[in-house]
Amino acid sequence: NGYLLIDVDQQEKKIEIERIHLEEDTAKQLHFDTYTLLDYNRCGVPLIEIVTKPNIRSGKEAAAYVEQLKNTLLYLDVSDCKMEDGSLRCDVNVSIRPYGQKEYGTKVEIKNLNSISNVEKAIDYEVKRQKALFLKNQTIDMETRRFDEQSKTTVLMRKKTSAVDYKYFTEDNIVPIQLDVNWVHQVITNLPELPHQKMIRYQKEYGLSNYDARVLTSNKELAHYFEATIAHYSNYKLIANWLMVETLGYVNKNNILLKNIKMKPQDLAKLVQLIDEGKISSKQAKNVFEQLMQKEQSVEEIIQKMNIVQINDSNQINEWIQQVLQEFPASVSDYQAGKDRAFGFM
């Protein structure tokens, strides 16, 4: 009765889980144009296979499910989930059927998809391929295919001989394990807040949009940084914007990990507070932000060094204006005569 909730186009959907079982890894396949290499370095490494029920209806939903599963595993410290390294992989089964038909069509398996984007692309292509065969009254064979990243198509690996053709062997030295229901409930009760739960809380508690909450919770470290920052200042929306735009932009541009940045949560909170109070402009704040990212220092130290505090005292500002007008009477006359460039000069 397990499931994960996904969010696609702001619509929530429950993806049910059929079962979870343990396996041993065999080898990593490296496919080339005319041959395939096998890397046996991870042979015998234990892995968890999580099988969903067939209620995923598109490549987009499948990608959202893998993303949610990945985030859940990361939140629970189960795995680093690096798809490019093979620590998280995805096989998909694709079938089509006419509207109104209850029985599923012939299932085609696509093996070892190594990125979330490829999951979506492979499914979308395979659906089109099967539709084309169906409309031509051609047979859709039960087979195993792989996704070719160059051509963005699925390529035949082998034909299947039966509906159950998994090529696996049971481990006779390990008896079946029956998990106690009370133990399962205890584990569930003690789980930390999971990404989907956190996303809903961010919307309700902090008034964030669905998009903002989804981005912030898509990365465990980002969510922790956000919560550490709002503990010091409570403009949730502005802090979220600075994290999603400026911080993630800097991290991606410089190819660094979020956990390795120099800026501390309390410094970002102080920066946002100064913007709110009108003591520095957004442009000035970006300059301070760059300095915070490059070296461990406080906001106050940077502002003092850069001498960029914004003056909001209207009496002081009026006094300076009068000084400028008195110092440049010719420019005042030019502006009054319609020469706008004089204003820029002053």
Describe the residue ranges of each PLM region.
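Conserved structured core elements
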Residues: 41-44, 59, 63, 86, ...
